[in-house]
């Protein structure tokens, strides 16, 4: 997993989805076609922040390396160097894990 050379603008972040287990606690293997897309990911790049009404730059609350939860339909899917990534606004992030 090479570091992305994509730098998001403003209050956007680049997220790599964290895959869920493909086997249940009871040992049943879940096929890829039945799995939902994970709503958990790791931030790999952050923008510089948004500007407030006075024009002052407000930095983001998240940083590269944070594990986050986001909505099922959040972000825009992009493929970069063969890797599926999401670009989303900080407002689409529901929380930081850990």
From Swiss-Prot:
**Any one GO biological process:** chaperone cofactor-dependent protein refolding
Task: Name the domain of life.
Answer: Bacteria
A Pfam family cross-referenced in the UniProt record is Cpn10
Q: Which PROSITE patterns match?
A: CHAPERONINS_CPN10
Q: GO molecular function terms here? A: ATP binding; metal ion binding; protein folding chaperone; protein-folding chaperone binding; unfolded protein binding
Q: Which SUPFAM superfamilies match?
A: GroES-like (SSF50129)
- Which positions carry the signal peptide feature in this UniProt record? none
Q: Which UniProt keywords apply?
A: Chaperone, Cytoplasm
Note whether Chloroplast occurs among the keywords: no
Report the locations given in the UniProt record.
Cytoplasm
Q: Spell out the GO cellular component terms annotated for this protein, sorted alphabetically and separated by semicolons.
A: cytoplasm
Q: How does it assemble?
A: Heptamer of 7 subunits arranged in a ring. Interacts with the chaperonin GroEL.
What is its biological role? Answer: Together with the chaperonin GroEL, plays an essential role in assisting protein folding. The GroEL-GroES system forms a nano-cage that allows encapsulation of the non-native substrate proteins and provides a physical environment optimized to promote and accelerate protein folding. GroES binds to the apical surface of the GroEL ring, thereby capping the opening of the GroEL channel.
- By its UniProt entry, which PANTHER family does this protein fall under? 10 KDA HEAT SHOCK PROTEIN, CO-CHAPERONIN GROES
As for family, the record states: Belongs to the GroES chaperonin family.
- What is the protein name stated in its UniProt record? Co-chaperonin GroES 3
Per UniProt, what is the name of the gene that codes for the protein in this document?
Answer: groES3
